[in-house]
């Protein structure tokens, strides 16, 4: 199923006009092939130094399926055990990512997305959402749920430019 974000770009009943950063939402079994196509010849072809952020569980579940995408990106696999969207995780990403990243692909669930959107916001690069589990607060939000200085809070971040759901991974 393809959701055209332009369908939502109309005056709201509240009287305000809301901006939508997401250009496309695709939820189907062929989402990986669509992502490969977009990276090769579509709207993502301009990005030459993408970074994939995922955790050990997600990497194991998607390694074969996303092999071609992983081959063309820097892939940063975070340890899933005890992983939190906090300063420690941010520091791990910052210490291990290449300096010239121009796109982030968040492959995983909520914590990976919060880390990715926070990094994308701080480095002013777009990110792609590749959810592998249902979300409690939304993959297209413009805030990240971060634990900073021991306190969980929402901080300004960025919405993805595209959501490509791996439906057979994210099904319960």
Predicted segments, located by residue:
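ATP/NTP phosphate-donor binding region
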Residues: 1-103
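Anionic group-transfer/hydrolysis microenvironments
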Residues: 56-57, 133, 168
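Glycine/threonine-rich beta-strand-loop-alpha-helix active-site module
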Residues: 85-165
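Residue-level detector of conserved catalytic or cofactor/ligand-binding positions
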Residues: 164-172
């Amino acid at each position: 199923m393809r959701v055209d974000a332009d369908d939502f770009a109309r005056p709201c009943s509240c009287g305000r006009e809301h901006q939508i950063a997401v250009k496309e939402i695709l939820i189907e079994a062929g989402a990986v092939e669509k992502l490969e196509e977009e990276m090769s010849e579509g709207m993502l072809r301009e990005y030459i130094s993408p970074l994939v952020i995922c955790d050990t569980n997600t990497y194991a579940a998607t390694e074969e399926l996303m092999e071609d995408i992983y081959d063309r990106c820097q892939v940063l696999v975070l340890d899933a055990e005890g992983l939190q969207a906090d300063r420690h995780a941010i520091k791990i990403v910052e210490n291990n990512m290449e300096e010239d990243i121009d796109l982030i692909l968040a492959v995983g669930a909520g914590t990976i997305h919060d880390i990715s959107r926070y990094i994308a916001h701080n480095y002013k690069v777009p990110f792609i959402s590749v959810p592998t589990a249902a979300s409690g607060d939304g993959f297209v939000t413009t805030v990240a749920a971060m634990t900073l200085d021991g306190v969980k809070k929402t901080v300004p971040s960025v919405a993805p430019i595209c959501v490509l759901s791996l439906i057979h991974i994210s099904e319960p």
